[in-house]
Amino acid sequence: MNTQILILTLVAAIHTNADKICLGHHAVSNGTKVNTLTERGVEVVNATETVERRTIPRICTKGKKAIDLGQCGLLGIITGPPQCDQFLEFTADLIIERREGNDVCYPGKFVNEEALRQILRESGGINKETTGFTYSGIRTNGVTSACRRLGSSFYAEMKWLLSNTDNAAFPQMTKSYKNTRNEPALIVWGIHHSGSATEQTKLYGSGNKLITVGSSNYQQSFVPSPGARPQVNGQSGRIDFHWLILNPNDTVTFSFNGAFVAPDRVSFFKGKSMGIQSEVPVDTNCEGECYHNGGTITSNLPFQNVNSRAVGKCPRYVKQKSLLLATGMKNVPEIPKKREKRGLFGAIAGFIENGWEGLVDGWYGFRHQNAQGEGTAADYKSTQSAIDQITGKLNRLIEKTNQQFELIDNEFTEVEKQIGNVINWTRDSITEVWSYNADLLVAMENQHTIDLADSEMNKLYERVRRQLRENAEEDCTGCFEIFHKCDDDCMASIRNNTYDHSTYREEAMQNRVKIDPVKLSSGYKDVILWFSLGASCFLLLAIAMGLVFMCVKNGNMRCTICI
């Protein structure tokens, strides 16, 4: 029992005030919450937004060849109604359509017009070439009051073919055009549906009318349908415009006996452009690459929540209004000095959770105390290593989204040319895919950033531990108690990775021998106390048994066993 009293006295009497160096990381009082693959609302030191929500309410055209069609509808640049006379040939990389724009003058429609619009929006402008068609025995100057210039006129790029005189027979004719260029040609023709059978006879003579159009990959016959219809622009008749893309060295042939609106010129495309439908004004003083009906999106972010129908070099549209990308480490706000001890590598996460709000010069750093006082310094090497790996995360995220979604976008662009309005449904489906992938990509990057920051912290800890070796002891709070006097120069050598443990080894070993026997945690004290108590009890029992045995042997004690 005297042994127990001696140990307790030594523990209470001997006190160590060793020099100490601690490792920690930058922290802020209020961080930003992000989502990772495994957890939502993880607080980090800093983060950046990846979803653009702002737009410029103007069409920015600085540095671009932009064409504002105004009252001219996009399809009108092919046929040439009066409102489109100034746009029959042009070059542009941005085509702006307005709601007031009209494709026709004489009432009618374009067949498969959405596909044709898509082609023209991407055309880069057009130039034209005459078909070279000549006619005899008919009139080629049909006009209408619906298409007015100085007076009645017609589509500038079309010929309205009529009988030589009213009610006269229209002769059977065949006309052919061969595309001799090394690029596709766009050819448009019309079928006239008169307001009545009487009007059709007056214009084209009596009898059934038939128009046949054929090329190597196109064959179609048309029969006009005369009949009463509501008047539009003073006309009850209609013209249906049809079109085809004629490949190089291919020939298209038209056979007809009336009710045919013939092409006078064919169109060729000049390059690449994009088209937008918008009512906002044009601004030649600002630049842009991404447009929508409400203006221009100027952003380097990978995603946008402005408009799902934006065109050009645009961030990908997602449903989320915000997706924060972590650009800093996990935030652990600084705890007051009398804080609960945290485990180091014994903890589940293995992360040194020492957040220091005063560490502003770097992500990772040191605090020390010695005879000269206390100090704090950042570790620039580990900080730079982490920054180098995190810098460019936003650009890498943009690359991932472009590579992942561009193929889908191109695939559905082809579908749009074929089935027109079905693209509205497919785009909604694509938005769902983009939104899911955006969420996943940002969460993956955030997970990587946090894991990376943890890794750099642990690397720094291991670097210090390997330097100090047996000259110091870990205290399970991210600190090392040093068993020798370590002035500011010594502390600097630990931080700079130039510490020589052999220089201080002898002093450290001497101090370790003095400190170790009495530097016991409460758990070890309990073990020693119980061991000492057990040993004392065993010794007393052995003495008692020895006395009993001697008494029995000498006859001073008798033991009787009764059964």
Curated annotation (Swiss-Prot):
It is a single-pass type I membrane protein. InterPro entries: Capsid_hemagglutn (IPR008980), Hemagglutn_HA1_a/b_dom_sf (IPR013828), Hemagglutn_influenz_A (IPR000149), Hemagglutn_influenz_A/B (IPR001364). Disulfide bonds join 22-479, 60-286, 72-84, 105-147, 290-314, 486-490. Residues 548-563 are cytoplasmic. The record marks 342-343 as: Cleavage. It comes from the Viruses. Major glycoprotein, comprises over 80% of the envelope proteins present in virus particle. The extent of infection into host organism is determined by HA. Influenza viruses bud from the apical surface of polarized epithelial cells (e.g. bronchial epithelial cells) into lumen of lungs and are therefore usually pneumotropic. The reason is that HA is cleaved by tryptase clara which is restricted to lungs. However, HAs of H5 and H7 pantropic avian viruses subtypes can be cleaved by furin and subtilisin-type enzymes, allowing the virus to grow in other organs than lungs. Belongs to the influenza viruses hemagglutinin family. HAMAP family: INFV_HEMA. This is Hemagglutinin. The lineage of its organism: Viruses, Riboviria, Orthornavirae, Negarnaviricota, Polyploviricotina. The gene is HA.
